[in-house]
Amino acid sequence: MVTMTSADKALKTLYLGAITEQLNTEVNPLLAKIKQSTADVWGKEIRRVARYGINGGIGAGSETGDLPKAEGNHYEQFVCTLKNLYGTIEISDKAMRASANDAGAFVNLLNDEMDGLLKASAFNFGRMLYGDGSGVLAKVSAASVGNTISCDSVKNFAVGMIVGVFTNDGVDLGLGMRRVTDVDRENNKITVDGKAFEADDVDAGCTIHMQGSVDNEITGLGAIFKSTGNIYGLSRATHKWLVPYMKTDVGSITETVIQKAIDYLDETAGSRVNFIVCSSGVKRAFQKHLATYKRNVDVMNLEGGYKALSYNGIPIVSDRFCPAGTMYLLNTDDFTLHQLCDWKWLEGEDGKILKQNAGKPTYTATLVKYADLICAKPCGQAMLSGITEE
């Protein structure tokens, strides 16, 4: 007979290892390429020493002259706060009792919940990789009334998400958290539940965030690929090596454009690109370019079951969350997802995973991970934007 105790045991012993492996390697092709480590985590912070420049103690001299003066490496310390990543499943008491005498039915129930958790995680963690940590899903493009909101883009939305409307500075407008009930991808609009918005409630320029995520998401590519401001506690104005290579208004994507960026990184930063990610429209434009010149399109198989185009042995992967008209050329060896620990179930003082929701006949279990993404060498990465899509 299935009991709460046996359900807890199943989540701990049978599901945790499998779901952790899938979350780490099958959520996103870029995430699968990034190493994960518990090193450099101190309390609630990541403190990592970053080396830049070269050692100064080298030189040539005469047979009897002075040896080169010793000059060590240059170091700075990156500091950032661990982000709190959660994934929650919910099972009703009725469903638990209905499957109490049928182990197979209960396994199917848990499998279905886990599958839903994986799909939601793949969507949200994949989205965060390209964000700037602010949690902004989209900006409101026009004043909106009723329950439909016009956005500048809806690629970060999915039916079922719980979102809120904020000012451009991240201040909650007090309109409550709303569940997305429809996503109009043709017209860049979303529909949410709850009370209809009135005039002046939602104005152009407002931002839409995931519940609880304002300035709480990981430091994604959107934060790394900037030329001003601070990152990891250091100023880009002072430390130019924190600024990646960024070329705008590219237009048509060609092998020459890609190679120029790769050569620049190699010559100026000693960085070797090993992973290229772009939007689907950019990938199609590159495929069209290859077809125009009768070039063969080579396909590579990546870890996690992903397939990619090949450019001189470098995988080119399209990602739904990559900004339109954009291609990133990365050395993933410079990236690390620093974490306090791998995915774990949130346990109560009694060691139980499944907990009853107060006042409701439902039980929840929550996966947690405390981590953030650090790029040790931002100047060794490149971004091409303004690419004409197909």
For the regions a language model picked out, list residue spans one by one.
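Core alpha/beta structural scaffold of self-assembling particle/tube/pore-forming proteins
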Residues: 1-57, 71-390
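Short, glycine/acidic-enriched capping/hinge loops at junctions between secondary-structure elements
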Residues: 59-62
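Helix-start/capping segments and mature chain N-termini
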Residues: 65-68
